[in-house]
Regions:
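Short acidic loop-to-helix transition motifs that present clustered carboxylates
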Residues: 108-111, 161-165, 188-189, 359-362
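Generic structural signal for alpha-helix starts
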Residues: 86-87, 115, 137, 160, ...
């Protein structure tokens, strides 16, 4: 796993590295060298480097110097003369580079900048670093849209200029990079809000050869789950296994209005590996669900006049749930009074539980001042997983603003830390999904935009249930297990986008692609670890 840092954590880590003997000036040289080497992989004949006033610009000056030494024609666009750059380190390398075989253009007009961009094979963005926030000012408010309109290939150093490295928010405009070469560790803003849209492919340069020894000296905002981290979850089934030892799941879901949610969750749990899946649904929709799921038993639960779980549902559901290895509650169940009673009853059972969708909305209605103010309501010995998207998560913490990855992680941690249980994990769903446990936050593979479709969350909930039921012995690493499930959902999303087109994917497309997604994920895990098939030519 690869740490993801906040801007404050990056500053602390650089200070530690400096105390260990590598100065900020040396880090700038290493950053510029790494960026230059990544640009050289694109085989450019001519490169345009845009620099700003600070140390990110210094990285750009160093990169320009190295590219020139490698035989690349280099133009540098600067807002001021090298001697006028306010940052001391950047001013030093700018003076040095300006005396070499490069062309420096100070404060060009828009037309002059367009000409320079048109000549370049690659544009290097070294305008702003991780300290940028707020609004763009001239000349950068002119440079950035001009680059976006005219450049064919942009490589940003550390973060795309205009992006808030902490929140991922773009207030005005931002460089749209094909590649972002980030230094020491990825920044949290690259995965949050607008970050993924503007950053392009991410490449991380460690810069410091003892980074692994010191990076744990600072807290991590999160960690990226890499394909090889999941390799243990792709082991083949034992030949002597039976359906019950593969794990049993009860799906408590559905209503007359939303029967499909229960159907999709149940099918997904089965496709994810559970050996025995059953559904407990209101009797108003039970027959419809039975017809759609011929291989899955369906329990008809007393319903109310609107076809949701009724007043007698709690006792019936809880009695059934005791017999299962895992319970998923919530998809399509509404927030009726009976549904709220079912949720509170399941929380009291000694069984692994996943709360999704309306089950979370029921919780929010029960605890109107935020569930983090009522941790006894959800503190339990058995595993508990909550899967809110941003709006649901905001309701759970009584309206705290949740609109990007950083605020989602903060809200999820409020819920987890209030309970103080190693068995509680909140999966904050978004463009980048965060798996938040009491001690760590993991960022698994993000899926395509096509996953933003109704019912996609029901499929993910089913995958989580099937995964938890099948692998309950993973008690020491719940977050990684759930990262595996989220990654499968993402892989299925990519497969569906390829099969049907990004804009045409519907949630049911994902279900039959869960199996193929496992195969692709397993292959990626082996490749990430450098393990090849015996028949490979490599």
């Amino acid at each position: 796993m690869k740490p993801v840092l906040s801007t404050e954590e990056v500053v602390r880590l650089e200070d530690i590295i400096e105390r260990e003997g590598t100065s900020k000036a040396e880090l700038m040289e290493l950053a510029g060298e790494f960026a230059a080497n990544e640009v050289l992989k694109l085989n450019p004949d001519r490169v345009l480097v845009l620099v700003g006033f600070g140390n990110n610009g210094g990285d750009g000056w160093v990169a320009a110097d190295i590219l020139s030494h490698k035989g690349v024609d280099v133009d540098i666009v600067s807002p001021v003369e090298p001697d006028e750059i306010p940052a001391a380190l950047a001013r030093h390398v700018a003076r040095r580079t300006a005396g070499r075989d490069v062309h420096v253009c100070v404060g060009p007009s828009r037309d002059e900048l367009e000409v320079l961009i048109d000549k370049a094979d690659v544009v290097v963005d070294a305008i702003f670093g991780t300290g940028f926030h707020g609004n763009l000012r001239a000349p950068f408010s002119i440079w950035i849209p001009t680059v976006n309109e005219c450049a064919d290939c942009v490589v940003s150093i550390d973060v795309p200029s205009g992006l808030n490295a902490e929140t991922g928010v773009v207030d005005d405009d931002c460089i749209r990079a094909e590649h972002t070469v980030t230094m020491i560790a990825p920044k949290i803003g690259l995965y949050s809000a607008d970050g993924p849209e503007y950053a392009g492919d991410l490449i991380c340069g460690n810069l410091y050869d003892r980074l692994d020894e010191v990076i744990d000296d600072v807290d991590h905002a999160a960690e990226i789950v890499e394909p090889g981290d999941l390799v243990d979850y792709f082991a083949p089934l034992p030949t002597n296994i039976d359906k019950y030892s593969r794990g049993s799941v009860l799906i408590v879901a559905g209503s007359a209005q939303y029967p499909g949610a229960a159907i999709m969750a149940a099918k997904s749990a089965a496709r994810a590996g559970a050996g025995y899946v059953a559904v407990a649904a209101p009797d108003a929709c039970a027959n419809l669900i039975r017809m759609a799921l011929p291989s899955i038993p369906v329990f008809a639960i007393p319903s109310d006049s609107r076809g949701s779980f009724g007043a007698a549902a709690r006792m019936t559901v809880c009695e059934i749930a005791k017999k299962y290895g895992c319970v998923l509650c919530g998809p399509g169940m509404t927030t009726s009074a009976g549904a709220m009673q079912v949720v509170s009853g399941l929380l009291e059972l000694d069984v692994p539980l996943i709360l999704d969708a309306d089950a979370l909305n029921c919780l929010a209605k029960i605890a109107i001042d935020g569930i983090d103010s009522n941790p006894e309501m959800y503190r339990r010995e058995q595993p508990l997983v909550m899967t809110p998207h941003y709006r649901e998560l905001s309701r759970l913490v009584a309206g705290d603003e949740v609109n990007d990855l950083g605020t989602a992680i903060a809200a999820a941690q409020k819920v987890v830390w209030a309970a103080g249980s190693d068995n509680l994990v909140v999966i904050a769903k978004g463009p980048t999904t965060a798996i938040c446990g009491v001690e760590r936050v993991l960022l698994p593979l993000s899926g395509p935009a096509s996953l933003a479709t109704a019912g996609s969350g029901d499929v993910l909930a089913g995958i989580l249930a099937g995964t938890l039921a099948t692998m309950r012995d993973e008690m020491d690493r719940w977050e990684l297990l759930y990262s595996y499930a989220v990654a499968l959902h993402s892989y299925a999303g990519f497969a569906a986008a390829t099969e049907y087109g990004e804009k045409s994917v519907i949630a049911t497309d994902l279900i039959d692609l869960i199996g193929p997604a496992m195969e692709v994920a397993a292959k990626d895990a082996l490749e990430d670890l450098g393990i090849m098939d015996e028949g490979s030519d490599d």
